[in-house]
């Protein structure tokens, strides 16, 4: 395979990284406005992200791309597998505000952050500007999470 194929793979990983963060923004905005039914309907779309990330990781492996891309690409795949298992296979609705966090939620959040760090680092392996773009997208996603938490706490105080 040529170097050009590796470049296209990198661009696709960056693109799907941006899609990943955009979908998380949508999920947190839906939660903020208490549209859980719509969020639940979106969960298969979120889980479908597993397909391009796995395919791109396998292609990176097959063309012999450097091990750095393989290592930093793996955490997002692990997170998406866990998310797929939790949402679609167990058919459990997420429990967003427990008094005591169950171990599954702790694992979920750790995998989300580790996957995001890996995804952002992949961007930096490609170029500084792509890495920065993914980090900015991560903070936009975290801002939408903060908005969701703000709305939740505000509604809780109103009760």
Short names for language-model regions:
Residues 7-34:
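N-terminal signal-anchor/start-transfer transmembrane helix
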Residues 15-20, 69-81, 128-140:
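Hydrophobic core segments of alpha-helical transmembrane domains in multi-pass membrane proteins
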Residues 22-26, 80-88, 138-152:
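Transmembrane alpha-helical segments that form the membrane-embedded catalytic/substrate-channel core
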Residues 29-43, 62-67, 91-99, 122-127, ...:
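Membrane-interface helix-boundary motifs at transmembrane edges
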Residues 36-52, 96-112, 159:
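Juxtamembrane helix-loop boundaries in multi-pass membrane proteins
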Residues 43-71:
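Membrane-helix boundary elements
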Residues 74-87, 98-122, 136-141:
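Hydrophobic alpha-helical membrane segments
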Residues 113-159:
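Terminal transmembrane helical module of multi-pass membrane proteins
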């Amino acid at each position: 395979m040529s170097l050009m194929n590796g470049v296209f793979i990198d661009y696709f990983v960056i693109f799907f990284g941006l899609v990943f963060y955009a979908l998380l923004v949508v999920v947190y905005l839906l939660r903020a406005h208490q549209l859980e039914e719509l969020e639940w309907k979106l969960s298969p779309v979120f889980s479908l992200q597993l397909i391009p990330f796995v395919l791109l990781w396998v292609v990176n492996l097959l063309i012999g791309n450097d091990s750095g891309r393989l290592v930093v690409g793996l955490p997002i795949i692990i997170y998406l597998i866990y998310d797929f298992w939790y949402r679609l296979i167990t058919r459990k609705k997420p429990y967003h505000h427990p008094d005591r966090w169950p171990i599954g939620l702790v694992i979920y959040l750790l995998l989300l952050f580790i996957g995001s760090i890996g995804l952002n680092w992949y961007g930096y392996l490609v170029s500084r500007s792509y890495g920065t773009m993914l980090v900015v997208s991560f903070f936009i996603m975290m801002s939408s999470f903060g908005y969701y938490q703000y709305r939740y706490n505000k509604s809780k105080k109103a009760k």
